[in-house]
Regions:
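Sec-dependent N-terminal signal peptides of Gram-positive bacterial secreted proteins and lipoproteins
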Residues: 1-26
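Exported/periplasmic ABC-transporter solute-binding proteins
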Residues: 21-70, 86, 106, 114, ...
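Short acidic/histidine-rich motifs immediately flanking catalytic phosphotransfer sites
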Residues: 48, 96-98
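Signal peptide-proximal N-terminal region
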Residues: 67-79
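Short, well-ordered coil loops that connect the C-terminus of an alpha-helix to the N-terminus
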Residues: 75-76, 98, 192
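Ligand-binding clamshell of periplasmic/extracellular solute-binding protein-like
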Residues: 82-89, 98-113
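Active-site charged/polar residues at nucleotide-handling catalytic sites that mediate phosphoryl
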Residues: 95-96, 210
């Protein structure tokens, strides 16, 4: 049936282009564009969709990886859902269709992993498919043209800083930030300066717009937004490494392509793209 539809669509395309030859100017162009759009839609419907839920901090890198993966797998259409890892995990637990999950922290993946002892959902990942994909860094960032002479995390507890943007407690970047500031002993002192964002992209946006003096985000987001990194967190002051685990959902309706995508994420081509955006390969 799909083949029949494609043949009809192609016939329609050639017919419309032929008719368009008799038209003039913009009318002919419009006919060709409309026909091409219809054919593109038919071709898209012929592809199998693979739904990937991924941490918001991976937006730029995975969008580029999508193009490379689809070149090698022309029968697959990658569909992304980017948000905070906590939000994505909740959506999966509530039954949202998802084939692959990539979190910005182990916590959210553990809550879907039947072998972790922390699982809190009926839906779950396939633990055999789980692996640590990437590592990131927690940084203090300001606008490139900021007039504030902020140079360190310690400056957050001075008059240099009036407003700070952090991710909220449900967001991995917020959890990393809170553990860092508590371990530094300045969390309680600066709480009144903090504005909380729903995910790392919102925090990054506030810094870029100058809505806050500074913010704590991943190095990859600072780089993508053209922000100035003034300090990087001491790893010993974080409760855990900033690790991005990936896994296939047990209920995936497209397991074969999900496995292909997981494999592609480990390829040299994907690693090159991740490194371009500032990610490190997880050890």
């Amino acid at each position: 049936m799909k083949r029949y539809i494609r043949i009809v669509a192609m016939s329609l395309l050639y017919g419309l282009v032929f008719v368009g030859c008799g038209a003039k100017g913009n009318d002919a162009k419009d006919v060709k564009v409309d026909a091409k759009t219809e054919l593109d839609q038919v071709n898209k419907e012929d592809k199998k969709s693979l739904t990937v839920f991924a941490a918001a901090s991976m937006t730029e890198s995975l969008t580029e990886i999508k193009d490379e993966f689809e070149k090698e797998n022309p029968g697959v259409n990658l569909v992304f859902n980017f948000d905070s890892s906590g939000t994505l995990k909740s959506q999966i637990a509530e039954g949202a269709a998802c084939d692959v999950f990539i979190s910005a922290a182990s916590k959210q993946m553990d809550e879907l992993d039947p072998t972790s002892g922390k699982k809190d959902s009926d839906l779950e990942i396939d633990p055999d498919s789980r692996f640590n994909l990437l590592e990131n860094e927690v940084t203090l960032a300001v606008k490139e043209d900021s007039s504030k002479d902020i140079k360190s995390f310690e400056d957050l507890n001075t008059n240099l800083v009036e407003t700070i943007a952090l991710g909220n407690a449900d967001v991995p970047v917020g959890q990393y930030s809170e553990s860092l500031l508590k371990n530094m002993g300045i969390w309680d002192a600066i709480k009144g300066k903090i504005t909380f964002g729903s995910n790392v992209k919102e925090v990054t946006s506030w810094i870029s717009e100058g809505a806050v003096d500074c913010g704590i985000i991943y190095s990859t987001d600072a780089k993508a937004a053209g922000l100035k990194i003034v300090a990087k967190a001491d790893p010993t002051l974080l409760d855990k490494k900033v690790i991005y685990p990936a896994a296939v959902l047990k209920d995936s309706k497209n397991r074969e392509d999900a496995d292909k995508f997981i494999s592609f994420l480990n390829s040299d081509k994907a690693r090159e793209i991740f490194e371009k955006y500032g990610f490190k390969q997880a050890e």
